[in-house]
Amino acid sequence: MAIIIGGVIGYERGHQNRPAGFRTHILVCLGAAIVSMIQDQLRVNILKYTILHPEVAQVLKTDLGRIGAQVVSGIGFLGAGTIMRDKGIIGGLTTAASIWATGCLGLSIGWGFYYLAIPAGIGIIIVLV
């Protein structure tokens, strides 16, 4: 699903000859989805471990938002690379925003929030077209 939604958004950007296109948006969406799935699996593993070893329950902690927050800020730096200034005109802001939004979509897909990701992806595409 991340490949499809990221690809549709990236196709629109590439079709408009923007600095980040088809492959970039797929990789951002897919990468964010993978990170969120890894984080969710780590949380499950920690919970299982604390059930088996209750003596470590006060030491081990899990924070569902921590890794996702790092993805969101990291993608912001990637998007910043698409922003250019030429003769006083700033361009690439929409592409930067689409990269950031695509990363957020990837996180929601990886965590299984399809009911949020699908309408949000459609909304992003409508805004870009």
Language-model regions: role of each:
Residues 112-122:
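Loop-to-transmembrane alpha-helix initiation sites
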Residues 6-18, 77-90:
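C-terminal ends of transmembrane helices
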Residues 123-129:
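Alpha-helical transmembrane segments and their membrane-interface exit regions
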Residues 15-28, 63-72, 86-101:
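Short, non-helical or kinked segments that cap or interrupt transmembrane helices
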Residues 1-59, 63-65:
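Alpha-helical transmembrane segments and their membrane-interface boundaries
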Residues 52-62, 76-87:
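Short juxtamembrane and helix-loop transition motifs at transmembrane-helix boundaries
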